[in-house]
Amino acid sequence: MEGVNGKKVGHLCENISSFVRQCIFSILSVGPVPSHIAFIMDGNRRYSKKQNLLDGNGHRAGFSALINMLKYCYELGVKYITVYAFSIDNFKRRPEEVVSLMKLMQEKIDELTKEESIVNRLGIRIYFQGNLKLLSDHVRLAAERAMVKTSGNSKAILSICVAYTSTDEIVHAVQESCEEKWDEIRKLDVNNDGSNLIRLEENVKDKNEHRIGVTNVDRHMYMSVCPDPDIIIRTSGATRLSNFLLWQSSHCLLYSPAALWPEIGLRHLIWVILDFQRNYLYLKEKKKQS
């Protein structure tokens, strides 16, 4: 009997919490709402030590925080959510820690793609961004399955950056742009003797047309599926970007709450949205000038 009553109370509290949240989001929606929020999920290990948890449980608590934040962003009307899950630099950690994180990552990826998962209930499409070749086969295949399984979802987009750094992304985009331009130029050499390439070199207009520009690099970025972020939230109080979205973050708001990632909550999101709305005109003007 107590168990049944406990469930009823829990369900009632959840309904009240959801109602209050919807009221708050309705008020916030009167002002501008960001289309893209990115998160640097910092502090899982420190949270584990702080709470005297077993290895890996800090990251499990962090996953729960991600699910809650994903739900809040969706309810607020944020179309794009990006999370920095695993840097290329993280491969330099102790081998046993990397193996443990890879196992946990695979477990949580599979959990996200279940029929009853939050991403399917809310219609969220998942992209994994980064140098996926660096991942173990099991994790890479799980990521690929998740992208295929959620490809029909269109209400919001969750980009999960794994085996990612911004410098690697930029190098990748420049390489792809060079190869694309070279293929275009080679197609002009119909005689395969270089004569058309010489004429191209002499024609200033054509030469400029085949130069690599910012738009070419933008198109080949891992993050090309999303607009530039409006807000980057890094937990644990650190203000550095740690090689995350350096190309895309020149005109976004950076928020660094002292809370560790598993401790992040609704109040932090509300605060940063209010800060974004206060600075909206300034940020908009800066984007126009760029």
Swiss-Prot record:
Catalytic activity line of the entry: n isopentenyl diphosphate + (2E,6E)-farnesyl diphosphate = a di-trans,poly-cis-polyprenyl diphosphate + n diphosphate
Molecular-function GO terms, alphabetical: ditrans,polycis-polyprenyl diphosphate synthase [(2E,6E)-farnesyl diphosphate specific] activity; magnesium ion binding; prenyltransferase activity
Cofactor requirements of the protein: Mg(2+)
PROSITE patterns: UPP_SYNTHASE
Gene Ontology annotations for the cellular component aspect, listed alphabetically: cytosol; endoplasmic reticulum
Signal peptide range: none
Record SUPFAM superfamilies: Undecaprenyl diphosphate synthase
Residues forming the catalytic site: 42
GO BP annotation list: polyprenol biosynthetic process
Similarity remark: Belongs to the UPP synthase family.
PANTHER family, per the entry: DEHYDRODOLICHYL DIPHOSPHATE SYNTHASE CPT3, DEHYDRODOLICHYL DIPHOSPHATE SYNTHASE FAMILY MEMBER
Function: Catalyzes cis-prenyl chain elongation to produce the polyprenyl backbone of dolichol, a glycosyl carrier-lipid required for the biosynthesis of several classes of glycoprotein.
Protein name (record): Dehydrodolichyl diphosphate synthase CPT3
Taxon lineage: Eukaryota, Viridiplantae, Streptophyta, Embryophyta, Tracheophyta
